[in-house]
Amino acid sequence: MAELNEDVFAAARQRGRTLLTEELVALIERHHPHDRPGIERDIVTRYADGLDTDERSSSSSRDGGPDDDGTSFDFDRDAFLDEVDARLADTETWQGTDALYAPEDDRVSRYPARWHDALGGSTDVREFVVFLLEETDGYLDDLESGGAGRGIPEDELLDVVSVVGRTDRETAKARVESGRKAGDLVEDADQHPEARVRPRE
């Protein structure tokens, strides 16, 4: 049985009460090793169990008070798992930022099956950008981050590449930088801290 990745727990604790259901699924999908689209439902449950144990242990040590940094995690295992089930969309296309997807039976993903079918396991960042710009109805409209322009906000791009490409964000970022240096990718020159990435025309 695969070991659970401590980076998931660390990132979840850091986010605390602001951690959203879809963000936790994406964290698991990004950090837990896997070679197929999405994460096994049992693996998601194991992480929920671990976070629940972590929360109960922390609550006991602080007697119900705030964490040392002034925040409280308040993770509810059962509510999280119920929310995962409720958000599963029976579709292969993008259904909004709150949706989760089942790219295969008993597997959960932050992104639709069609994205995995087209790009699963790839780290060709230009291919990702073109796909996200041209083949994902509604996705760009749902993004709240990024500067002006018609490209993909870099942080969002790194999320998609790391999850669908089944790699780490450092590798994804290195691929973006390589694409810029090669002239395959450009950024809109609006000086926004998260400028949008697009293919060179």
Where are the model-predicted features located?
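Acidic, polar-rich N-terminal leader regions of halophilic archaeal proteins
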Residues: M1-E201
